[in-house]
């Protein structure tokens, strides 16, 4: 498993944000990472993330942290507008990759597209649900003990294109209920309910 280290400065910055968000150290936290620098083809529809957030709050006693990187404000905004769930949108705080490390390490689970933060979760031994569309899972087929890949087998996938030239079915045919099932399975197996 890869290792990541957190400096005192990075941890202090994350602690300040967690205090701002009023996240208690005893609360369970699920991180949602809806973006992908690679391109839109790796992004699960924000409307689906919005529905997933509602389902997670119905099923789990947890707080939801929405991580959004540079250029992902519109994705985060759509999720916030479409969801009835209580979601903490971190986009306005412009969390950089250094501070994202301790933020993800604080999460009890991460639900993400196939993008960099998934590897942070693996490095911190966190359960992670990866919604995978245009990429071949064989490229990252290591350290999957606490990882569930949710994907669709389609003739056009994996295409490895940043933008889908077709109808983006590799992502749009993965439904929130399916991702929820994967998350609930990982939660039961890995997250202490105490």
Feature names for model-found ranges:
Residues 40-41, 74-75, 120, 138-139:
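Glycine/Thr-rich phosphate-binding loops of Rossmann-like dinucleotide-binding domains
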Residues 5-8, 95-99, 155-158:
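A short acidic, often aromatic-flanked loop/helix-cap motif at beta-alpha or helix-coil junctions
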Residues 78-82, 87-91, 122-193:
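Nucleotide-sugar donor-binding patch of glycosyltransferase catalytic domains
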Residues 46-133:
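Donor-binding and catalytic core of enzymes assembling or modifying cell-surface/extracellular glycoconjugates
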Residues 1-41, 190:
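Mid-sequence helix-capping/hinge segment at a functional interface
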Residues 41-45, 170:
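Short, solvent-exposed loop/turn segments at secondary-structure boundaries
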């Amino acid at each position: 498993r890869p290792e990541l280290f957190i400096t005192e400065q990075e941890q202090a910055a994350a602690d300040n944000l967690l205090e701002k968000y009023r996240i208690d150290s005893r609360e369970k936290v699920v991180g949602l990472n809806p973006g992908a620098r690679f391109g839109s083809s790796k992004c699960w529809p924000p409307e689906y993330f919005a529905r997933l957030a509602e389902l997670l709050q119905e099923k789990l006693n947890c707080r939801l942290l929405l991580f959004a990187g540079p250029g992902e404000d519109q994705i985060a905004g759509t999720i916030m507008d479409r969801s009835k769930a209580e979601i903490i949108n971190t986009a306005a705080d412009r969390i950089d990759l250094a501070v994202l490390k301790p933020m993800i390490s604080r999460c009890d689970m991460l639900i993400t597209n196939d993008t960099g933060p998934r590897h942070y979760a693996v490095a911190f031994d966190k359960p992670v649900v990866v919604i995978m569309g245009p990429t071949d899972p064989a490229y990252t087929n290591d350290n999957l003990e606490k990882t569930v890949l949710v994907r669709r087998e389609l003739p056009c996938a994996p295409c490895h294109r940043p933008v889908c030239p077709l109808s983006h079915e590799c992502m749009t045919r993965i439904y929130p209920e399916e991702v929820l099932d994967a998350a609930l399975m990982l939660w039961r197996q890995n997250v202490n309910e105490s």
